[in-house]
């Protein structure tokens, strides 16, 4: 089996250099039992990883108003939990997410639906945890936004992304912000105007999809290997990386001041770096941060 790959920013356990070798067959993590269920989703947690599974396969995992609100609450809750380091979002069945549920009262709830989507994408975008979209199938409309608001995206080769709203006399008003940001103006505009399917291989070449797996089983391997790499990334340092990215992306003039604040904080007594550098000096180059003593004394 073959995969298309890119490199990640985390160290592999056997090398000093960053690596994202998804051709290797690392041990698949055994998932815990379902922690909770809601109307259209399931939540599983193991160690520092939370998995959110969209579970409306009969509706293409479409986002109902209630599901959008529930997902927002989940991301807001996990954002404040020290035990959570990563959040994986994926779908059950054929589709990743087919967008907003058009079977609901579209016109009566238009404003509420727009606000619910804005809140959802805002909660994911602002989440200090590393977010991963494991895209198991096609995504339409809001589902495309759901994938590309996440930090890292891996997809099965049979997936595609379609901003099909224009065919219905609509436009992807809420998700366009994130699609334009991640895809660039030219591709995003073409995709919105033509409603053409955008295939994962093209997005991988652009660097906005970070791995493409041959099939769904291979996607599981890709995802677990990525999570294994991310296990070596210190959680607070990861949150700072995301915060710096937001500052730069938004063109904030206070980026340098913010960077100085982080530079001082990250070397303070009791910080992750105090532990990490001490371990490095002892010859231990890779730390499983879920097991790090410094995190358990907080």
Swiss-Prot record:
Record's keyword annotation contains Transferase: no
Source organism superkingdom: Eukaryota
Coiled coil: none
Disulfide bonds: none
E.C. code: 4.2.1.-
Keyword check for Transferase: no
Metabolic or biological pathway: Mycotoxin biosynthesis
Keywords linked to the UniProt accession: Lyase, Virulence
InterPro entries associated with the record: ClpP/crotonase-like_dom_sf, Enoyl-CoA_hydra/iso, Enoyl-CoA_Hydratase/Isomerase
Record region (Disordered): 1-23
A Pfam family matched in the record: ECH_1
GO terms, molecular function: lyase activity
Function, in words: Enoyl-CoA hydratase; part of the gene clusters that mediate the biosynthesis of the host-selective toxins (HSTs) AK-toxins responsible for Japanese pear black spot disease by the Japanese pear pathotype. AK-toxins are esters of 9,10-epoxy 8-hydroxy 9-methyldecatrienoic acid (EDA). On cellular level, AK-toxins affect plasma membrane of susceptible cells and cause a sudden increase in loss of K(+) after a few minutes of toxin treatment.
Further information: Gene clusters encoding host-selective toxins (HSTs) are localized on conditionally dispensable chromosomes (CDCs), also called supernumerary chromosomes, where they are present in multiple copies. The CDCs are not essential for saprophytic growth but controls host-selective pathogenicity.
Family statement: Belongs to the enoyl-CoA hydratase/isomerase family.
Name of the protein: Enoyl-CoA hydratase AKT6-1
Organism (species): Alternaria alternata
Gene assigned in the entry: AKT6-1
